[in-house]
């Protein structure tokens, strides 16, 4: 546990259907093995389940556990059923499809939460196609009533869209349905914020512009001034011909002096003019201009948004070269925030 990295763990039903074979390996090739107890759930075609407990001892790379029932075609494995295991749980293709399809029907919140993490990690490791993942998650998301799991799933879906997929149309439709129909007001608000961040179609952007302009939030969705401010940044980037008007209008709406100064600092980062954005970036390389670190991070994030990543490529090297000075002059956590602002919105 004190070494970097984590084990890659895979549980498969044996060819004769009589046992569960679980193996672990060190993906970094150092031959390390992890001692831990793991839980797997074998799901049978008739809906019956079997909880299989596996204990890895020192120097143990694999384990074979006999099943109480004969596994047949249609059985699948849910790994890390209790959520306590440490590692990347690699899924077979059939198990990944089955786990995705069973998310809405899974009643156990711990198991559901563990599956969300496992499925997302398999997406990141390219063992699940992004299209398959998104399709299944959009079927599941409106059924989730647990606020923590809903929030996690919403973040995973947003990342899947930003990193792997070009067309957000179906995601826009599902999110807007949640914004307007979800029973929980917090879910409506969370869905709206994700909708705002991924909206790309002319219809979606136009809808956001209209509600921002009229300051009229969707029914049952209470938006704060910060929500409208964030929306103005997104709209200025999406609608460059209206960017100056949007920024000027939002600046005039803000009455709090501190928030007004914050907006004046950050808003040039969404300018449609490259020379203005270059000037903002150059100013961020000066330590004095990073004194309010959240403002600096927000400006850098806007400069490196996905829609402008071709122009933003030139910021990456000098921003990384500034890290040593940032470590010396900033808060202990600011280097992490700086790198996240620089890279997290690029694909």
Mark where each language-model region is.
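Surface beta-strand/loop "capping" patches
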Residues: 2-30
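Generic alpha-helical propensity signal that fires on short helical segments
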Residues: 15, 38-40, 95-97
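Polar, glycine-rich mid-to-C-terminal structural blocks
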Residues: 19-47
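Generic recognition of long tandem-repeat/solenoid scaffolds
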Residues: 19-22, 61-69
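Solvent-exposed serine/threonine-rich low-complexity stretches and specific carbohydrate-binding patches
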Residues: 52-59
């Amino acid at each position: 546990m004190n070494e970097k990295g984590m084990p890659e763990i895979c549980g498969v039903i044996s060819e004769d259907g009589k046992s569960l074979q679980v193996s672990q390996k060190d993906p970094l090739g150092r031959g390390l093995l992890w001692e831990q107890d793991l839980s797997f759930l074998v799901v049978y075609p008739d809906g019956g389940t079997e909880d299989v407990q596996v204990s890895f001892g020192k120097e143990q790379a694999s384990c074979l556990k006999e099943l109480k029932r004969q596994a047949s075609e249609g059985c699948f494995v849910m790994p890390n059923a209790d959520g306590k295991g440490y590692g990347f749980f690699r899924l077979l293709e059939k198990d990944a499809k089955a786990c995705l399809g069973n998310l809405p029907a899974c009643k156990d919140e711990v198991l559901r939460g563990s599956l969300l993490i496992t499925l997302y990690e398999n997406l990141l490791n390219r063992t699940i196609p992004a299209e398959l993942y998104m399709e299944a998650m959009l079927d599941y998301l409106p059924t989730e009533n647990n606020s923590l799991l809903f929030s996690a799933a919403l973040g995973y879906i947003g990342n899947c869209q930003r990193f792997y997929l070009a067309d957000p149309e179906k995601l826009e439709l599902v999110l807007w349905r949640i914004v307007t129909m979800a029973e929980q007001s917090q879910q409506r608000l969370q869905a709206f914020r994700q909708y705002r961040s991924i909206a790309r179609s002319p219809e979606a952007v136009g809808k956001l512009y209209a509600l921002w302009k009229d300051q009229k939030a969707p029914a049952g969705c209470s938006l704060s001034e910060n929500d409208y401010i964030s929306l103005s940044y997104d709209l200025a980037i999406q609608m460059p011909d209206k960017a100056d008007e949007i920024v000027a209008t939002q600046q005039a709406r803000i009455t709090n002096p501190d928030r007004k100064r914050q907006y004046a600092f950050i808003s040039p980062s969404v300018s449609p003019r490259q020379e203005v954005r270059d000037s903002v970036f150059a100013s961020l390389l000066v330590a004095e201009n990073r004194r309010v670190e959240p403002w600096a991070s927000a400006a850098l994030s806007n400069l490196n948004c996905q829609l402008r990543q071709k122009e933003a490529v030139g910021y990456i090297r000098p921003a990384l070269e500034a890290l040593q000075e940032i470590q010396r002059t900033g808060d202990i956590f600011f280097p992490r925030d700086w790198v996240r602002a620089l890279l997290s919105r690029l694909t």
